[in-house]
Amino acid sequence: IDVEVVFEGGSDEFGEKRNRSRWWDCSLADAVMNYDALPVIDYNWMHQDHEFTDGCEYLIITPDGSDFVDKANEIAEFRNKQGILSQVVTLSDVGGNSTYAIENYVNDAYNNWAIPPAAVLLLGDFGYSITNSVIAPIYDNYCASDNIYADVDGDHLPEMIFARITANDADQLDVMVSKFI
C-alpha cells in the first residue's frame, strides 16, 4: 500500500525545531513510520551561548525551604554534568504553591522559552506548605495527578515528562536523591 501525505499551509516543517528533544528522538524512531523523513536536528545549538534565561531541558520545581533548594541545586548540578541543561526554580519563583501558578509557569516555559523543558521534576511530597511540599491537581474531583501539568495544549496527552520525588524533610530527601546521584 502506498500512502501519499500532502501538506498545505504551515511552514513545511514537522513541528517546531524548539519542541524537538534529543531525549524523545529514540522513542520517536521506534514509534513513527518513516522516522528518517524527519529532518535531522543538531541539538548542540542548545549548549552554545545560552544562559539559563533561555530555558532548559530539565526543570526542577522545588519548595522554598533551604533543604529542598540545596538538594534541587545538587540534582541540577548532577544533570548539568551529564550534559542535560537543568534549572531550579522555587515555588515563589513560580508564583506560589497552587495548581494555577505551577501550570501557568510550566505552560509558559513550554510555549515561550527558547529551550522548552523536556522533563520537569517536582521536588517534595503533595501538600500546601510552600516550604516543604508541592500541590498536585485533582483530576475529575477524585484523583491527584501531576500529569495534568504536562498537558500543555489541552489534548489530555503530555507534552513533557513529569516526575516527583516525594519527601517531607531533609532526611527523606537525602534517601531519595542518593538513589541516583
Identify what each model region corresponds to.
Residues 74-87:
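Short helix-loop-beta junction
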Residues 89-98:
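Short beta->alpha junction loops
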Residues 86-90, 119-121:
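Short hydrophobic alpha-helical runs that function as membrane-insertion/retention elements
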Residues 66-71:
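Short, charged/polar "capping" segments at the starts of alpha-helices
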Residues 1-57, 62-65, 77-80, 98-181:
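Structured catalytic cores of large enzymes
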